Amino acid sequence: AYLGGTVNNAVITVPAYFNDSQRQATKDAGLIAGLNVLRIINEPTAAAIAYGLDKKTEGERNVLIFDLGGGTFDVSLLTIEEGIFEVKSTAGDTHLGGEDFDNRLVNHFVNEFKRKHKKDLTTNARALRRLRTACERAKRTLSSAAQTSIEIDSLFEGIDFYTSITRARFEELCQDLFRGTMEPVERVLRDAKIDKSSVHEIVLVGGSTRIPKIQKLVSDFFNKDANKSINPDEAVAYGAAVQAAILSGDTSSKSTNEILLLDVAPLSLGIETAGGVMTPLIKRNTTIPTKKSETFSTYSDNQPGVLIQVFEGERARTKDNNLLGKFELTGIPPAPRGVPQIEVTFDLDANGIMNVSASEKGTGKSNKITITNDKGRLSKEEIERMLAEAEKYKAEDEAEASRIQAKNGLESYAYSLKNTITEGKLQMSDDDKKKIEDKISEIISWLDNNQTAEKDEYESQQKELEAIANPIMQAAYGAAGGAPPQQRADGETEEKKDEEELD
């Protein structure tokens, strides 16, 4: 409804540090919502697309995307050359963002309240919620002002809480968190084997990059100003929209022509070999989509089968990495250890989702897996069940939505009519005024007692109200030399038009 049409296909962005399981879960969620997910792309990569369109330059440019949002933090280093984007390295923290800065403020004021009033705010969830809302507002204000005040009436046990905080105090409270954002920046540069002096542009993305201290830390580290020309809240969505246009074949915009996007695997992917060793097939920061094969053999004589265990992570031992899935390849003919040739292939698609296969070259026996057994992942059967449920209850859901729409329409019409009459700007007789007011009161009273009525009952009530109100209101507007506001007829036509487009 927001876009005025049906949305079938989507490009969905995820934090660069999302693992395989989280990416698949995101794709599953899109499928359940009725979307054909064309591509899952990293948020910093999406921001880079937006940046690439804004800044067309000759030659290769190294761009660092610093994305600090409400709950996650991502840093990516990209090269952009002649419309080709390549992610060289990524790093970050999935649990750092604006909420953590809010928490520091909340804790600070909880302690202040305890000092002043000898009361513990943490025992009251509502008081904490009100304080958190005020803290978030204060944090935003401190991005443009040197100090701000917090005023909350009757915060806890009837006590009003009036206080203030300076930007300097806020920066001190969050000092370790702010400085901690530099570590992933250094790691990204190390991984990409690029010196900070070789970074041509720094792009700030995410609402939390509006904090002046964050901007200063970044500019001091690189000894140059960060690029803030892109709206930090819109950059990712802008880039995703451009990618969607490319994937759907829309080349109507000159900007979307000749752009090639190369994403990377955020973590190394490999299998367990003898002794619990992690043997990577796809190294971290490999450009995707990619396909890698490697040949392995048996560990003992006459071994009838092998267990292929797939892991992601950077640790040398598999026990320290994340198990994605496993499967067995059986039917290997008896042979001395080291003789059978088992080819393992990792096929990682553009969405970061992987198919793993293994085949024994001598017999041609093979087996494969699309990783599905991780906790964060839905099986095909579960997805089908959820889709079936959505289809099963579709008619009921639509009927309920239609009923609520009729109820809201009647309520809005009655109250707007009441407000128009109360303002007293229209000339009408006392009898006419009383007639409408009585009917409005009757309708409002009926609404209060019939919150679960059927759609046709609401429509019937609205027709009754219109039958009385419309002639009187038209006469009143005519006398005032104006036109009455468009009431239900136009609104209903508009709704029907939208519904036809949606179908």
Curated annotation (Swiss-Prot):
The keyword Nucleotide-binding applies. Transmembrane segments: none annotated. Residues 475-488 have a biased composition (Low complexity). InterPro entries: ATPase_NBD, Heat_shock_70_CS, HSP70_C_sf, HSP70_peptide-bd_sf, Hsp_70_fam. GO terms for molecular function: ATP binding; ATP-dependent protein folding chaperone. The keyword Lyase does not apply. Residues 475-503 are annotated as: Disordered. Keywords: Allergen, ATP-binding, Chaperone, Nucleotide-binding, Stress response. Belongs to the heat shock protein 70 family. This is Heat shock 70 kDa protein. It comes from Penicillium citrinum. The gene is HSP70.
